[in-house]
Amino acid sequence: MDEVLIGEVIKPHGVQGEIKVYPITDNPKRFRKLKEVILVQNQEQRRLKVLHANVHQSEVYLTLEGINTRDKAEAIRGWAVKADRDQVPPLKEGWYYFELEGMQVYEGDVLLGTLAQVIQTGANDVYLVKGDKGEICVPALKTVVKHVDVAGKRMDVELPPGLIDGEELR
């Protein structure tokens, strides 16, 4: 089953094993619906049942089965928090960031590079594309992004004039 990164364990909270999680989402309330999480560090992976999820503004606190002391919570500090993809609610429109990252970005037949990061700017997202000749920031606009093939890991773009200095990436 596909796993999705949803956060990172920041620190223990209290003495009964509750953990504070840094959520990687713009809607932390999604954590309330989780039945299970996967904690990952290096090659170690632990699947744990979510007993309780408390969300206060942008802060997330989880109580997990088997993590019932501060020492046990401290032992998982810094671990990645993942969920099975079927536990991640669908978006109203568009794609998940993790589906876009790693895509090969083309303009026509020319490979510009790999989509390395989705940057939220407020107005519109920007795709950071890293290629052999450097990095470019591609605005996530319908006028620029012409086609996205999630299964094929390919994005086709038509860059606006002047976005690349001297055409060095083409």
Swiss-Prot record:
GO MF term set: ribosome binding
Domain of life: Bacteria
Keyword entries, A-Z: Chaperone, Cytoplasm, Ribosome biogenesis, rRNA processing
Keyword Chaperone attached: yes
Secretion signal, residue range per the UniProt entry: none
GO cellular component term of the entry, any: cytoplasm
Protein name (Swiss-Prot/TrEMBL): Ribosome maturation factor RimM
